[in-house]
Amino acid sequence: MMLTINAIPTDLSGIDPDTPLLWALRDHLGLVGTKYGCGIAQCGACTVWLNGAPVRSCQLTVGTLGDASITTIEGLAADGLHAVQRAWIEEDVAQCGYCQAGQIMAAAALLEKHPDPSDEQINVAMAGNICRCGTYVRIRKAIKSASSVLRSSVRFFDPGESELSVNPVDSDGVRS
């Protein structure tokens, strides 16, 4: 069985198909950023993206995934930190930090779907992610901050570069 995990084709044929994705990621592939919280898909610590949508990896078995694309916290940003990860640091969200990988994956998925989310959209998207330390105010602030950063950046292709570049723009749409 082949999956794409963090943009890398990955052969999982040696793993029992009834193994939860969470344990395949952690125990077999060494991707330990995704955390075990409750094991019943209620806390959100194990959140990863399945074909771009946030899901609980503790309840998905590898045998049910077909040729899916999985993104974990380790693969969220191609180079460096994702805007949500930077905002998490800048807003000092983490207290114990155990929930943050799942929280960040859920928040980044929200911003993919709703670049400028309302408080209600944030509440709905983040409802399945529990923070035992209660840093919900800082989580919301980080999501709003990341939203602002992502919306103030424009992607353009420079023929002299091999990849897309990101340049900030001001409120008038002028690249700085």
Name each model feature, range by range:
Residues M1-S176:
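Signature of N-terminal electron-transfer/Fe-S-associated modules in redox systems
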